Amino acid sequence: MSITTEITAHYWAFAVFLLSALGLCVFMLTGGFLLGARARARSKNVPFESGIDPVGTARLRLSAKFYLVAMFFVIFDVETLYLYAWATAIREAGWVGFIEATIFILILLAGLVYLVRIGALDWTPERSRRLRRAGPIGETPRHQE
């Protein structure tokens, strides 16, 4: 078999794969659209829980501070992933990798110190209001009432 025939066979196999995957997606979406129930009632957005009628509303408003905590979790989770990858390859990285990891940790710690200084981690509104009135970090008075 020549090289051209092998390449053509690979392209055909890939084309058949793409067409079958696309066809399966179209089939599933069309089947769901045609066979699915259409409810225009008010209870369409109500979750179904074992046949029990819901009491109250399921729409809760969360404070933005919960999203802040979630973002901190994501940031420090990604930091942990980078440090784990560095720790598994510490012998290959050597001192250069150690210095780079130290710089990475120091940058993240500087960001954390900055967030603590501006009051981004405070859950009480009094300190946040006081810091907003005070101005930038360098101009914050020590004793303010």
UniProtKB/Swiss-Prot annotation:
One of its GO terms (cellular component) is plasma membrane. Its EC number is 7.1.1.-. It holds the Pfam family Oxidored_q4. Keywords: Cell inner membrane, Cell membrane, Membrane, NAD, Quinone, Translocase, Transmembrane, Transmembrane helix, Transport, Ubiquinone. The chain crosses the membrane at residues 14-34, 66-86, 96-116. It is an enzyme of class 7 (translocase). It comes from the Bacteria. GO terms for molecular function: NADH dehydrogenase (ubiquinone) activity; NADH:ubiquinone reductase (non-electrogenic) activity; quinone binding. NDH-1 shuttles electrons from NADH, via FMN and iron-sulfur (Fe-S) centers, to quinones in the respiratory chain. The immediate electron acceptor for the enzyme in this species is believed to be ubiquinone. Couples the redox reaction to proton translocation (for every two electrons transferred, four hydrogen ions are translocated across the cytoplasmic membrane), and thus conserves the redox energy in a proton gradient. NDH-1 is composed of 13 different subunits. Subunits NuoA, H, J, K, L, M, N constitute the membrane sector of the complex. This is NADH-quinone oxidoreductase subunit A. It comes from Sodalis glossinidius (strain morsitans). The gene is nuoA.
